[in-house]
């Protein structure tokens, strides 16, 4: 019997020995197979060399140089084709690139492109002919320094402009996968690029492509979604129907028409709207959309257009590819499918650049590479079902990341559908609800998504990666999608540019895609049609700007409402328990009578960038000076248009102290007929008065009286005042601490028709029924600080930083579901949702800011078009 010791030591040794022998045998077997294959390959090559090759002999009927094989048309039928016939004579005609085997090939008429010795002369070379067959350095391998000098061949008086869109290329892809997209990364390195391009809302394909080429928001150009209904047309638009080819849907003027109207020629190889007779006109050269056309064919055709004679050659080109959007939808943004798609579009872009280099056009063409939107992951367990909120669903819903709800019964019930009830029934229903319902006029102004009959009244803003759908029958989930709030990082798109007009090796701040249209017009040296962009705001991308902006001209001049009498002729129903005698009143009223030195001092401190100019006609505003704030008063509206003041960095972030209670008095500088009455209220609407400039923001106990006056009153809903007061007493202190002081300009907004522009006086009067004081639709706040936070706002010598808000003035705070919550849990978030650009504030108020800031206007426009974002997660 074996011992235990033998079992535990000898048996493993035997097993290891056997294992070694097995490995050695396998290795020897592999070597034997390899040697056999090598011998066979050598024998085969010798046989092939003896037999002959089809190189330069494709479809030649003669037998010269061929032994035992043929390369003519009939060789397949006879079975005597040379060994390389298929590769050389058949497959080479089906690819769009050269290789060493194709170089010097016999010209074949069936080839997609040629690598023959005469292809340059015949202008049908494959795009990479010179780099593959003539040994030139490929574009992607060239150093940026070799492409610095602008140069155009003879006949190119105006540098051509190419607009290239890669659908769904989110900005993060280029950061994460830069090594997998060498051609695109080369463009980024050598040219100018933004951190990202902000799409318009909804972040969908058709709305954003048309925004890019018109400079208009979707609400302005009419393509508000990929799917929509128009009550006036009584028709539905979708990407799968022929109705999308109806010009009635396409409003505004796309860049190809702008160029053609001004004598230029254009060529479009796919772009939403380019195969539609918009305004009765097609582009000079265009292709009807067909997604089956290979990307290589699209590039080759565009390059052939560049080869046309000067009289026929387009000046402007568009080209579009569907990836990486398609793979993003199929597999999600973080997937092998997207990586493969990125490599495909990079190879496609590389072909374009090789073709341009081959034509000596790399430093002649201005090329913009961008995307329409980004992409986010979706999950089938992240769906909000309307069936969970309604016992029965008797409405129609556009489902997904940008949902809208309307009546089923169209057109009969389109205008009578109770949208308000739908929003009420969807508001604050669950503690973990993943969407917020809005009536379109109440949506954040930064979205510019309200003023179009095609925009349904009920809109849901959905959390990232979630979708809102009708019921559990919905199955479009689990891959990727887009359409979300355009502030989400996952929706950010790419923007890169290169060419003789663009700066090199430059990164710029993000900007909105509405600005691209004006940029294209500048590159083409043409006048843009009216649009939502801010012309000149992208001048910093260009070496030599074509257009130099100037400040808007003031249309209504401010006078000064001066101090004339120390006591009011009419108390306007005001009273103050602390000011019982006329001498008390006179004492505080005398504080309103500033000397010229005091006016100069308050202007320097509280209007450090100059007072806002009024770009409204037929107004009679006046300036009201105080030591701690300055306001521009509108006598017709009986309220300030704006108030401006500077909050210094505080010693701590404690909330501001309360002010004297129940204390108001008439402003003696404003006529009673032009003032609000202290007793003004609309009890049925729960409206009372609030203060535009916060009285608690006082440096001395007496200075609060400068704010407790009728000229500082604005009408406010009680619920809104809760939020307004918290902002000024808590958040403003916090911002001043973080930014080393802030300048604040705030005021009312009147946009009853929700078109994003200030209402004319007669429009305001139409809505101000049964009240002498019109009720604002929104209030704005613009916070300005110094980007260099070692400097205060009133002493800032460099760039400014801005944080603007446009807050809907609503009777409730249901948007934030504040019940049983302290203001600290919802007010700041509410303000952040309603951030805006300074330019949005200007359009809504008719004001123009920063006219006295010592800085080029184009740089001021960069500031005005900046949109603060608070999203950090992708």
UniProtKB/Swiss-Prot annotation:
Role noted for this protein: Hydrolase that metabolizes extracellular nucleotides, including ATP, GTP, UTP and CTP. Limits mast cells and basophils response during inflammation and during the chronic phases of allergic responses by eliminating extracellular ATP, a signaling molecule activating these cells in an autocrine manner. Metabolizes extracellular ATP in the lumen of the small intestine, and thereby prevents ATP-induced apoptosis of intestinal plasmacytoid dendritic cells.
Residue intervals passing through the bilayer: 12-30
PANTHER family: ECTONUCLEOTIDE PYROPHOSPHATASE/PHOSPHODIESTERASE, ECTONUCLEOTIDE PYROPHOSPHATASE_PHOSPHODIESTERASE FAMILY MEMBER 3
Its EC number(s): 3.1.4.1, 3.6.1.-, 3.6.1.9
Pfam families: Phosphodiest (PF01663), Somatomedin_B (PF01033)
Major localization listed first in the record, in broad terms: membrane
Residues on Cytoplasmic side: 1-11
Family named by the database record: Belongs to the nucleotide pyrophosphatase/phosphodiesterase family.
SMART domains, sorted: Endonuclease_NS (SM00892), NUC (SM00477), SO (SM00201)
An MF annotation (GO) of this entry: calcium ion binding
Disulphide linkage map: 54-71, 58-89, 69-82, 75-81, 98-115, 103-133, 113-126, 119-125, 144-190, 152-364, 380-477, 428-817, 561-622, 574-678, 576-663, 786-796
Record note on modification: N-glycosylated. N-glycosylation is necessary for normal transport to the cell membrane, but is not the apical targeting signal.
Cofactor: Zn(2+)
Organism: Bos taurus
Gene3D superfamilies linked: 4.10.410.20, Alkaline Phosphatase, subunit A, Extracellular Endonuclease, subunit A
Ligand binding (ATP): 204, 226, 275, 289
Residues reported to bind Ca(2+): 751, 755, 757, 759
Gene Ontology BP terms: ATP metabolic process; basophil activation involved in immune response; negative regulation of inflammatory response; negative regulation of mast cell activation involved in immune response; negative regulation of mast cell proliferation; nucleoside triphosphate catabolic process; phosphate ion homeostasis; pyrimidine nucleotide metabolic process
Cofactor note: Binds 2 zinc ions per subunit.
GO CC aspect terms: apical plasma membrane; external side of plasma membrane; extracellular region; plasma membrane
Record domain SMB: where: 50-93, 94-138
UniProt-annotated catalytic positions: 205
Annotated localization: Cell membrane; Apical cell membrane; Secreted
Top EC group: hydrolase
Name of the protein: Ectonucleotide pyrophosphatase/phosphodiesterase family member 3
């Amino acid at each position: 019997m074996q011992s235990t010791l033998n079992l535990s030591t000898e048996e493993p040794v035997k097993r290891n020995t056997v294992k070694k022998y097995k490995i050695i045998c396998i290795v020897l077997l592999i070597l034997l197979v390899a040697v056999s294959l090598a011998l066979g390959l050598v024998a085969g090559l010798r046989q092939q060399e003896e037999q002959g090759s089809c190189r330069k002999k494709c479809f030649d009927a003669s037998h010269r140089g061929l032994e035992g094989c043929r390369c003519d048309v009939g060789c397949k039928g006879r079975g005597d084709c040379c060994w390389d016939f298929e590769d050389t004579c058949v497959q080479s005609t089906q690819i769009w690139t050269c290789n060493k085997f194709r170089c010097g090939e016999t010209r074949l008429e069936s080839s997609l492109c040629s690598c023959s010795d005469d292809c340059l002369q015949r202008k049908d070379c494959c795009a990479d002919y010179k780099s593959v067959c003539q040994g030139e350095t490929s574009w992607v391998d060239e150093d940026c320094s070799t492409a610095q000098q602008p140069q155009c061949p003879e006949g190119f008086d105006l540098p051509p402009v190419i607009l290239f869109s890669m659908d769904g290329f989110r900005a993060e892809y280029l950061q994460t996968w830069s090594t997998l997209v060498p051609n695109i990364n080369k463009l980024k390195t050598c040219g100018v690029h933004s951190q990202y391009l902000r799409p318009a809302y909804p972040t969908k394909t058709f709305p954003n492509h048309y925004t890019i080429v018109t400079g208009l928001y979707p609400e302005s150009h009419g393509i508000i979604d990929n799917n929509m209904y128009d009550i006036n047309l009584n028709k539905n638009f979708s990407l799968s129907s022929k109705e999308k080819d109806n010009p009635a849907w396409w409003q505004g003027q796309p860049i190809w028409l702008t160029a053609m109207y001004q004598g230029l020629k254009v060529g479009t190889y796919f772009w939403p709207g380019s195969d539609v007779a918009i305004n009765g006109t097609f582009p000079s050269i265009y292709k009807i959309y067909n997604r089956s056309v290979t990307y290589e064919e699209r590039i080759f055709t565009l390059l052939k257009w560049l080869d046309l004679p000067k009289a026929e050659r387009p000046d402007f080109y568009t080209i579009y590819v569907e990836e990486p959007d398609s793979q993003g939808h199929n597999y999600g943004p973080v997937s092998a499918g997207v990586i493969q798609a990125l490599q495909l579009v990079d190879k496609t872009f590389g072909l374009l650049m090789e073709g341009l280099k081959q034509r000596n056009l790399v430093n002649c063409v201005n090329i913009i590479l961008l995307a329409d939107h980004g992409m986010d992951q979706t999950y089938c367990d992240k769906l909000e079902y309307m069936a969970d909120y309604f016992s029965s669903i008797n409405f129609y819903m556009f489902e997904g990341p940008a949902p809208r709800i309307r009546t089923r019964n169209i057109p009969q019930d389109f205008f009578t559908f109770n949208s308000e009830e739908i929003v009420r029934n969807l508001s604050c229903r669950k503690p973990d609800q993943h969407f917020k319902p809005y009536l379109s006029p109440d949506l954040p102004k930064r979205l510019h998504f309200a003023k179009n009959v095609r925009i349904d009244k009920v809109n849901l803003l959905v959390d990232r990666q979630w979708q809102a759908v009708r019921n559990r029958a919905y199955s479009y989930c689990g891959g990727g999608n887009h359409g979300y709030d355009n502030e989400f990082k996952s929706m950010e798109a790419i923007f890169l540019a290169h060419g003789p007009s663009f700066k090199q090796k430059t990164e710029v701040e993000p900007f909105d895609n509405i600005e691209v249209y004006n940029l294209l017009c500048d590159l083409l040296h043409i006048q843009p049609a009216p649009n939502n962009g801010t012309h000149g705001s992208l001048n910093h991308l260009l070496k030599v700007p074509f257009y130099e902006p100037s400040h808007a001209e003031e249309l209504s001049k401010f006078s000064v409402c001066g101090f004339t009498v120390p006591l009011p002729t009419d108390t306007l129903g005001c009273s103050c328990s602390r000011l019982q005698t006329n001498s008390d009143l006179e004492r505080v009223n005398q504080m309103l009578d500033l000397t010229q030195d005091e006016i100069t001092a308050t202007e320097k401190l509280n209007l450090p960038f100059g007072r806002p100019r009024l770009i409204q006609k037929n107004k009679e505003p006046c300036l009201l000076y105080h030591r701690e704030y300055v306001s521009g008063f509108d006598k017709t509206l009986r309220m300030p248009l704006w108030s401006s003041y500077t909050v210094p960095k505080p010693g701590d972030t404690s909330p501001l102290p309360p002010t004297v209670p129940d204390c108001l008095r008439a402003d003696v500088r404003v006529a009673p007929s032009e003032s609000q009455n202290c007793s003004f209220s609309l009890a049925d609407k729960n409206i009372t008065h609030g203060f535009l400039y916060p009285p608690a923001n006082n440096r001395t106990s007496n200075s609060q009286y400068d704010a407790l006056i009728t000229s500082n009153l604005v009408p406010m809903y009680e619920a809104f005042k809760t939020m307004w007061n918290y902002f000024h007493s808590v958040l403003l202190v916090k911002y001043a601490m973080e930014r080393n002081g802030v300048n604040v300009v705030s005021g009312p907004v009147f946009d009853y028709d929700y078109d994003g522009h200030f209402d004319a006086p007669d429009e305001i009067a139409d809505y101000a029924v049964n009240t002498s004081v019109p009720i604002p639709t929104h209030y704005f706040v613009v916070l300005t600080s110094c980007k260099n936070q070692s400097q205060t706002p009133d002493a800032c010598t460099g760039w400014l930083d801005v944080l603007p808000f446009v807050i809907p003035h609503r009777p409730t705070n249901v948007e934030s579901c504040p019940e049983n919550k302290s203001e600290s849990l919802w007010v700041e978030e509410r303000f952040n949702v309603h951030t805006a650009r300074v330019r949005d504030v200007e359009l809504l108020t008719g004001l123009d800011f920063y006219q006295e800031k010592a800085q080029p206007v184009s740089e001021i426009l960069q500031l005005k078009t900046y949109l603060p974002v608070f999203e950090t997660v992708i």
